[in-house]
């Protein structure tokens, strides 16, 4: 049985959100020290409040016993179209993070499902996100949730010949 609830994020969640973001960023920096800076705080209070004030935010937290256990942040936006792409409205998930002690309990799946509901209600035709290749656990979660690869972005390290 679930002891957690999914709710909208509020300004008072900032410290817990910042801790989750730092945890997530540290994992990225550890996996790709060549790419990510160490010790950087992803969200300032101003950035967090800007997300909450976005015209169509996805700003969700999972809470258990008064503590924030996970988050899902993003927004719904319109792409005007261009020479190649049709105009469309889509949801972009920027962050989906769960504290390690809460992983494997369905929290991230529930956060993603609620984000999907919000996206549909806002008229989005798709829900999109980016994931790093090293984050295999997240990739499995996304595939299980029904997300499919849209495109591949590849890199070649040019520093060593």
Model-derived regions, located:
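Conserved acetyl-CoA-binding loop-helix of GNAT-fold acetyltransferases
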Residues: 95-98, 104-117, 140, 144
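Conserved GNAT-fold acetyl-CoA-binding loop/helix
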Residues: 25-48
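Conserved N-terminal entry element of GNAT/NAT acetyltransferase domains
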Residues: 1-12, 161
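Conserved acetyl-CoA-binding loop of GNAT-fold acetyltransferases
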Residues: 124, 143-152
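Conserved beta-strand-loop-alpha-helix junction that forms the acyl-donor binding cleft
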Residues: 128-138, 155-160
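A short helix-loop-beta-strand connector motif used in the catalytic cores of GNAT acetyltransferases and
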Residues: 46-60, 92
């Amino acid at each position: 049985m679930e002891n957690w609830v999914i709710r909208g994020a509020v300004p008072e969640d900032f410290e817990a959100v910042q801790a989750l973001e730092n945890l997530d960023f540290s994992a990225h920096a550890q996996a790709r020290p060549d790419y990510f800076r160490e010790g950087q705080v992803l969200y300032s209070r101003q950035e967090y409040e800007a997300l909450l004030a976005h015209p169509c935010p996805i700003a969700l937290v999972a809470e258990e016993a008064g503590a924030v256990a996970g988050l899902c942040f993003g927004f719904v936006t319109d792409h005007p179209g261009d020479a190649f792409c049709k105009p469309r409205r889509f949801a972009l998930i920027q962050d989906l993070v769960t504290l390690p002690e809460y992983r494997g309990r369905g929290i991230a799946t529930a956060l993603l499902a609620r984000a999907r509901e919000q996206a549909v209600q806002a008229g989005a035709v798709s829900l999109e996100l980016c994931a790093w290749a090293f984050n295999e656990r997240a990739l499995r979660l996304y595939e299980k949730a029904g997300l499919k690869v849209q495109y591949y972005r590849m890199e070649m390290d040019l520093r060593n010949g």
